[in-house]
Amino acid sequence: MVKLRETEVILRLCIVFFLLLTSCLIGLDSQTKEIAYIHKNVSFRYLLALEAELYIDVVVAAYNLVQLGLGWYNVEQKTSNPKWFSYLLDQTAAYVVFAGTSAAAQHSLLVVTGSRELQWMKWCYKFTRFCFQMGSAIILNYIAAALMVLLSSISAFNLFRLYSPKRFFRFKSSS
């Protein structure tokens, strides 16, 4: 059980690291070029999906830090209610990060390819550093989402090991 707890702590630390690194890459990235004697600046604020992804990453990183803090102070969960809550929040966080990353990737693909119908130019020909940093941020976010899926499975194991395998939704101690 101790190894499982250590694994959960390491996973949460890695998730926080990847999410904060992604937030820094997205939030601090901007590039200015002179195009036809006009200074053009591009940043994450021009892409709504990247802005939403930044906020999602910060909130989920804060949630994982709170979970680490609860584990640090040995807040032992004797009943199943806090474990259910933790399990559902871990699941929700994993799904939200994956969905936000997928939306940001789709929006970024529009920036890479352009769209004649929407009069979007291909930004990556002009703003290459911006595009490479956004691409690396999206890859790091997918890694964080995969780690969160693994963390959710550990959370599910911690929850369902309390229940009896013979009686439906009965604690092992009461059967």
UniProtKB/Swiss-Prot annotation:
Membrane topology designation: Multi-pass membrane protein
Sites carrying sugar chains: 41
Pfam families, A to Z: CASP_dom
Membrane-spanning parts: 8-28, 46-66, 92-112, 137-157
Keyword field: Cell membrane, Glycoprotein, Membrane, Transmembrane, Transmembrane helix
Top-level lineage group: Eukaryota
One cellular component (GO) term of this entry: plasma membrane
Cellular compartment(s): Cell membrane
Claim: 4Fe-4S is one of the keywords in the record: no
Topological region Extracellular: 29-45, 113-136
Cytoplasmic side: 1-7, 67-91, 158-175
Main location per the UniProt record: membrane
Coiled coil stretches, renumbered: none
Subunit field text: Homodimer and heterodimers.
UniProt record similarity statement: Belongs to the Casparian strip membrane proteins (CASP) family.
NCBIfam families on file: A_tha_TIGR01569 (TIGR01569)
Protein's recorded name: CASP-like protein 2C1
